[in-house]
C-alpha cells in the first residue's frame, strides 16, 4: 500500500463524471463546487480543474507565505481562460515546480485512466501525474480564488517524506530531469529544496 494506492482506490469508488479526492482535515469552502463547475463548463475539452488555496496551520487560515507566493507565480499564466489549453505553457509551469495543489483538483474521469496515480511515488505522485496529463490536448482549468484550505501539520504524509533522509529529493530531481538537462535540474533543486521548509512546522 501507499499514497498512490489509496488515492487510486478512492478515485475508483466514485461513479460520477467528476471526482475530487478530499484529503483528511482539508477544508472546502461552500463555493468550491460552484467555482469548479463554472470553470469546467466554460472550458474547451477540460481534463481537470484546480484552484488557488490557503494553508491551515494550528487551526488558522494562512493566505500568504513563501510557498503560496511561489505557487501563485507558477500559475500566473493561467489566470485567463485563453491559456488553459496551452500544452506549452503548462509544461513550462510544471518544469519549475508543482504549483497545483492536489486536494484542490477536480478530475474529469472520461479524460483520465482508471488509476491516475503511479504506484511507487511517495511525495511527487501528484506532480508526476500532472506532468503526464500536461501532454494531453484539453484544458487544465484554474480558479484563481482560494476556495479550499490545505492543512499543514507534523503528521501529514508530505511532512513525513520530507523529514526522511533523501526521502523526497530523488523524486524531485527525477521530475526536473523530465524537463531539463542535468545541470539545470541540479540548479533548480537547490532552490526547490528551500521551499520544502514551508511544509514543516
Q: Which stretches of residues belong to each language-model region?
A:
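Glycine-rich, basic loop-to-helix element that forms the pyrophosphate-binding segment
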Residues: 1-14
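Short, high-confidence coil segments that cap the C-terminus of an alpha-helix
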Residues: 16, 43-46, 138
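Short aromatic/hydrophobic "clamp" motif used to bind/position activated sugar donors
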Residues: 19
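Conserved donor NDP-sugar-binding/catalytic core segment of glycosyltransferases
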Residues: 31-71
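Conserved nucleotide-sugar donor-binding catalytic segment
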Residues: 75-169
